[in-house]
Amino acid sequence: MVLIRVLANLLILQLSYAQKSSELVIGGDECNINEHNFLVALYEYWSQSFLCGGTLINGEWVLTAAHCDRTHFLIYVGVHDRSVQFDKEQRRFPKEKYFFNCGNNFTKWDKDIMLIRLNKPVRNNEHIAPLSLPSSPPSVGSVCRVMGWGQTTSPQNTLPDVPHCANINLLDYEVCRTALPQLRLPATSRILCAGVLEGGIDTCNRDSGGPLICNGEFQGIVFWGPDPCAQPDKPALYSKVFDHLDWIQSIIAGNTIVNCPP
């Protein structure tokens, strides 16, 4: 444990853009309350159980993982501590849901994306502000930020009231293909591979749908990770936002016929 803490602290010193240091997402640090204005929480409507994270990309639209979909769910914006109702938080319902169904040059691994139109726009405040879509694709070796209300212990299921943040590295896709042979990942894909190969830092269950932010840009959506979480040499998979920009922007613009990306 002492060694893990030392390694984590050395990594943190190298992260120039991070607003708050994180040792581990599993048992790690609480996100700075001003760091996640775009992070939303999805809840199952009837049970009021927490499902997933998501990202507010403008006042009326949220991007999350398709596997987070339920027949009825709620979206909370501006939340920090889930156990306390905050004056500035806002609740919305899905008005429309869109799923990425393009077939050309996209495999099943490239389609875990859901775009949600809210029933009414949110009002920006000091705790609510959208995160812009990326202007360019991410580079391997980038330092990336992940956050969410997912498990802080694994395999034990411990969910925190506040979001936890961590810094991980964007890895070459081949690293995930080699490390995760049971998935039989295709030779080429539009998913991102990210993690800390030494282990101890990772997203986990219920972090699904949340953002992967690399060098300050929204580059990925939490998609899949090994169980237990944070194992050495077991990185996780993220949907690549940049390769879905045409689809996202076409829907937001109101196009009824969406052209699939090349």
UniProtKB/Swiss-Prot annotation:
Disulfide bridges in this chain: C31-C165, C52-C68, C102-C260, C144-C214, C176-C193, C204-C229
Sorted UniProt keywords: Blood coagulation cascade activating toxin, Disulfide bond, Glycoprotein, Hemostasis impairing toxin, Hydrolase, Protease, Secreted, Serine protease, Signal, Toxin
Secretion signal span: 1-18
Transmembrane intervals: none
Functional description taken from the UniProt entry: Thrombin-like snake venom serine protease. Displays a specificity similar to trypsin. Releases only fibrinopeptide A in the conversion of fibrinogen to fibrin. Shows coagulant, esterase and amidase activities. Reversibly increases the permeability of the blood brain barrier (BBB) in mice. Induces the barrel rotation syndrome in mice, which is manifested by gyroxin-like, rapid rolling motions. This syndrome may be due to its effect on BBB permeability, and certainly also to other actions affecting endogenous substrates present in the endothelium, nervous tissues or blood.
Assigned protein family: Belongs to the peptidase S1 family. Snake venom subfamily.
Full protein name: Thrombin-like enzyme gyroxin B1.4
Organism listed in the record: Crotalus durissus terrificus (South American rattlesnake)
